[in-house]
Every structure is written in structure tokens, then in C-alpha cells.
Amino acid sequence: MELLSWGEIIIRILMQLMPVWISLVVLFALSILYKRRLGLYGKLFDSTIGMIGFAIVMFWVFAGFYAGALDLILTHDPLSQVSGMKNKVPGTPMRGAEENEYSYFLLGGDTLARDVFSRMIAGSTVVIVIAPLATLFAFMAGITLGLPAGYYGGRLDTALSFAANLILAFPVILLFYLLVTPEIRLTGMPQYMAAVLFAFPLIFCTVLINSRLYIVPQKRNIVLSGVLFVLLMLYISLINEDGSKITLFNAIDLFNVDGGLLTVFVSVVFVNSPTVFRIVRGLAMDIKTRDYVAAAQTRGEGPWYIMLWEILPNARGPLIVDFCLRIGYTTILLGTLGFFGLGLEPESPNWGATINEGRKLLSIYPHPALAPSF
């Protein structure tokens, strides 16, 4: 077999990503067709720039899903090393490829003879798992603390604002260096932080349901029991880790989370939560002076009902924008951490680690570093 030309490489990559293209076409067709019924999401498709940005985001979401969950678009195992493929240029054929094995390294091989294309696509699975979930957890923590701080004010606001400013004043990279050092990880600090931070979704869902259904106690109790049971199972599974300081109810531990992944996840939530807190606090301080809040107070509604069902819905615009932006910031942060070798395993196909490995021979073999950079 001969080396593929760049035209053949591009065509093969486009064909390999066919499930992604089909998903994008279906998503956009349905979204444009029903955009008038989709509220704020539908308005996105009135903007050309908005659609382009959304397409780029959803491309990597679908790529990560099909690569990680369904294993449809990867040409090779992103961790396996293939003899004779070290630093090979894009389009190099594999020697002795089996019948059911893809016969080319579409974007070449890296310094450890691993497929660059497969590692680039597999790296997106790390991003689509950590970035949205970490941002969601950070928002739940920030909202749970920011609403009462802005609504009540006083000493509670002073104490929480001081803690938030203290965290924000700490250098982010230095914080990550501290959390991933073996000595700190042996103390169980990441697990203790996870136990605290992951409790906020439980608190948020509890007060959300209770404030809405408090007038129908029987229905409230049923809904709360079901939701809290599921969340508690997830909570226990997230904070438990083999060999860690925290081992709660190992018999009902549904899944194991890699220690490096948990450290990165907790660190991202910890860094983002204070910023979300400050945004929510400022919005709550502004909105609590509105007439509809005074009307709710006159009706005798409780504080948490007012905060969650009067103030929070009217603050959704800035929060949605910040949520989307923060996912992008988190993606960049994950790449930075991977580049410095913090948290995730060295052989992980995350984009930052791949770029770091490829830069060492950038002048001779640029393709391993350039592919994940784009």
C-alpha cells in the first residue's frame, strides 16, 4: 500500500466522521424547523454566527459521544502502540494490518507509535464529560450560596463573600499543583473537597423541590424521596475511591472514579464556584428590589421560594450566557492542566497532554502536536 495524498486523507477523515455529520444535519434540520417553539434555544438559529459556534461545539460533542460511548469513529485504540508507526507522517499505511483493522494512520503516528487521529477524537470524550458536568456542579454550588448571600445580606453575605474572594485570590495553577501532588492526595484532601462540593447538588435539589411542593406534603415527600435516593447513590459513588480516606457504603458503590479524574473535576468546580457565587449574589441583590418580589413577600411566600422561583428565573439570561462561556473556559483549563501533566494519567489522550508530547519534536514531526491544537 502507498502513502495517501492529502486529498485522500481528507476524504477518509470526512467518511470516518459520517455519524457526526448525519447527527449535525438532523439536529440543525429539526431545530430550524421548530425554532419558534424552542424558546431561547430556538433564537440561536436566527444568528449565523450563533449557528456556526453551535455547530463547532456540537461537532465535538457528537465526536466524543460516538468515540467514547459507541466506538464508531475511532480507527485504532488511542492507547495502543503499533510497531513501525513511530512518528510516521499522515496517511502512512500499516504494515501487516489485519483484515478487520483500519489500514492507515490518517494523521500519522506520535513518538510512541500511537494513532494521532484516534487520540485527537478520543480526547474530546474527556472534555465533554468533565467540562459541562464540572460547570453544572459549580453553578449549583454558586447558586446555593449566592442566592441567600444576596437576598439576606448582612453577616452571611460578608462571610461568604470573604471566602469567595479568598479563593479567587489564590493562583489557579498553583492550586492545581498543590492538589495533585502525591503528598496532598495521600491525605485525602481531594476526596474531602469532593464530599463538600458534591453535597451542593443535594442541597439545591432539596430546597428546590421543598419550596415548590411544600403546600402538598404528600406529593413533596414522594418526589423528594425518589430524587434524593438517586442523588445519594451518585454522591456516594463519586466520593468513594479505592484506597482513599473516604469509604462510605462500598456495597452500593455504583462506579469507580479515577483518582486523577476526580482531582481535576473537584479542582475545576472549586475554582469556578466563587465566580458563579459573585454573579448570582449581584443578580439577587438587584432583583430582590423588584415589585414582583415584594408581591411574593406580601403573599407570605417563604425566602427559598422567592429566591428559587422569583429571583432565579429572572436571572436566567446572564447565567445561561456565563454557563456557556464557562464551559469554554473549562475546556481551555483542562488543556492547560493536561499540558502541564496535572491530574490525568500521562498516557491519557487529552488534548493538552498530546500537545505537550508532540511539542518536543515539533520542528521535525509537527503533526502529533498540530492535530489536537486545532
Name the predicted role of every residue range.
Residues 1-139, 143, 147-148, 158, ...:
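Gly/Trp-centered helix-boundary motif
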Residues 114-374:
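Alpha-helical transmembrane segments of integral membrane proteins
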